[in-house]
């Protein structure tokens, strides 16, 4: 059976423009040879191709997850957006249970979260859809508790969102019960005096009041208070039904956990913090949009389970596998490559090469690439599949130092040349790809350093000159390797091989 080495270069995309492109500027004769003499193709590594929102830059975690899974893995916001796009909110049993609880108890459903199109902690479209589904399910009493953003979006930008929300609640006979800036409702620094102010408004115990949400916004703006710092206030036109009390149900529609946990703790009196809530309520149901670590509640959208990633396929087929990376990227070739699970397969070996302990990798752009190559050359003959990661383009690219990134790529060029020559001599086939872009964009149009990832496509190159490769995305790589090795792919791997037969 053929043996394969899969090389994942971290943070190296492809683009034709030379300006600020360390990959085009570096002296890389072996890469030049790979692209001119070996089969190669383009692989998409960002946005919807890897289960992220459209246009979003790729990252190492998502990249390795998709490579190992053999299918597009939807995570976080994109997981919920896909459910929204596919009109699946109405089938979400966790939402339906919350709706049913308030109908049975003749109580109120409280929807709370960041009213924002920002997509960092929440997305207002999710709230609007939950309102629609609550109405369609016959929920009579719904109170919305609005948190102002002004941080992931412009400081004074909530008016349009608030107008949309007001129109919807009027249509369904629901109410905007409270308003507070995220400074209060979404503190994450254990400043519970802030969180308490938002909590008291939700309980109907705030001294600040408004009769119209939009008028209250104007009043706050007139005092130079922006969305983030809107003072917690309650709607004075509402009766006690619309403020949080026993037997009510809560849906917290923030999907990101870090700034949702303190307020959740106050409502649930959880064991996550030592702080004791000023008022205790016993809600019938508490739903978080995604998992809030340390908060016990019902979760509307769980992260996707990746069954049968490439490592499991090799294990089940009684094949051997080797994983090699330096400390900085070790979790990526193990935990993320294995579907977000920490598992050591019985026919496997893992080698972690120590990353250099330095303040900045700009000072040591070679990183541990030579040692990684040496370890692979020492061990790969004994394994059916070797997966390794070279961290240089990403970690040095993040420093924003162009000269160091050029050195990093030249070091990598030499190490790849060493590895491929050895593999060819030992009749082992190499596939080379990358998890996302970075080093190919080091300067912006104003010649300022760029340190972030990119949405550039990446390479897939193979040392087997008899092959032809089709273009694809990261999720096609595992099926391609299995196809090449004559192994069946599991049903979960719904992406195709890129071998052009």
Curated annotation (Swiss-Prot):
Keywords: Glycolysis, Isomerase, Manganese, Metal-binding. The keyword NAD does not apply. Its EC number is 5.4.2.12. It catalyses: (2R)-2-phosphoglycerate = (2R)-3-phosphoglycerate. The active site is at 60 (phosphoserine intermediate). The keyword Isomerase applies. GO terms for molecular function: manganese ion binding; phosphoglycerate mutase activity. Binds 2 manganese ions per subunit. It comes from the Bacteria. Substrate binds at residues 121, 151-152, 182, 188, 256-259, 329. Pathway: Carbohydrate degradation; glycolysis; pyruvate from D-glyceraldehyde 3-phosphate: step 3/5. Pfam families: iPGM_N, Metalloenzyme. GO terms for cellular component: cytosol. Disulfide bonds: none annotated. GO terms for biological process: glucose catabolic process; glycolytic process. Mn(2+) 1 binds at residues 394, 398, 453. Its cofactor is Mn(2+). It is an enzyme of class 5 (isomerase). Catalyzes the interconversion of 2-phosphoglycerate and 3-phosphoglycerate. This is 2,3-bisphosphoglycerate-independent phosphoglycerate mutase. It comes from Mycoplasmopsis synoviae (strain 53) (Mycoplasma synoviae). The gene is gpmI.
């Amino acid at each position: 059976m053929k043996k394969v080495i899969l090389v994942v270069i971290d943070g190296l995309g492809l683009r034709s423009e030379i300006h600020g492109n360390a990959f085009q500027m570096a002296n890389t004769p072996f890469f030049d040879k790979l692209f001119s003499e070996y089969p190669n193709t383009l692989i998409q590594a960002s946005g919807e191709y890897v289960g992220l929102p459209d246009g979003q830059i790729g990252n190492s975690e998502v990249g390795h997850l998709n490579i190992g899974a053999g299918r597009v893995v939807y995570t976080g916001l994109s997981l919920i957006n896909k459910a929204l796009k596919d009109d699946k909110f109405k089938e979400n049993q966790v939402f339906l249970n919350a709706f049913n609880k308030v109908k049975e108890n003749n109580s109120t459903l409280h929807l709370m979260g960041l009213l924002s199109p920002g997509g960092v902690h929440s997305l207002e479209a999710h709230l609007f859809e939950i309102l629609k589904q609550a109405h369609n399910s016959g929920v009579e009493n719904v109170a919305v508790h609005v948190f102002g953003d002004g941080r992931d979006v412009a400081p004074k930008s909530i008016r349009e969102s608030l107008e949309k929300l007001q129109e919807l609640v009027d249509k369904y006979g629901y109410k905007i019960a409270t308003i507070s800036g995220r400074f209060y409702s979404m503190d994450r620094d254990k400043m519970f005096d802030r969180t308490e102010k938002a909590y008291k408004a939700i309980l109907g115990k705030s001294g600040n009041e408004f009769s119209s949400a939009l008028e209250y916004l104007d009043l706050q703006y007139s005092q130079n208070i922006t969305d983030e710092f809107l003072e917690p206030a309650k709607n004075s036109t509402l009766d006690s039904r619309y403020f949080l009390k026993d037997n009510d149900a809560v849906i917290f529609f923030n999907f990101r956990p870090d700034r949702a946990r303190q307020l959740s703790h106050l409502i649930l009196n959880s064991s996550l913090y030592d702080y004791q809530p000023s008022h205790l309520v016993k809600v019938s149901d508490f739903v978080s949009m995604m998992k809030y670590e340390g908060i016990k509640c019902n979760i509307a959208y769980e992260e996707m389970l990746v069954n049968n990633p490439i490592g499991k396929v090799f294990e089940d087929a009684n094949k051997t596998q080797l994983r090699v990376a330096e400390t900085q990227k070790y979790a990526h070739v193990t935990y993320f490559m294995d579907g977000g699970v920490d598992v050591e397969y019985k026919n496997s070996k893992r080698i972690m090469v120590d990353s250099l302990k330095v303040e900045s990798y700009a000072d040591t752009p070679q990183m541990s690439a030579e040692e990684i190559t040496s370890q692979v050359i020492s061990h790969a003959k004994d394994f059916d599949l070797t997966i390794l990661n070279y961290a240089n383009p990403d970690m040095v690219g993040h420093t924003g130092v162009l000269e160091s990134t050029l050195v990093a790529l030249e070091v990598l060029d030499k190490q790849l040349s060493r590895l491929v020559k050895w593999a060819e001599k030992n009749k082992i086939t190499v596939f080379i790809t990358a998890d996302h872009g970075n080093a190919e964009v080091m300067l912006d149009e104003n010649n300022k350093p760029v340190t972030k990832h990119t949405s550039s496509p990446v390479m897939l190159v193979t040392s087997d000159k008899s092959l032809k490769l089709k273009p694809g995305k990261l999720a096609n790589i595992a099926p391609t390797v299995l196809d090449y090795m004559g192994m069946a792919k599991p049903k979960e791997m719904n992406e195709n091989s890129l071998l052009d037969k």
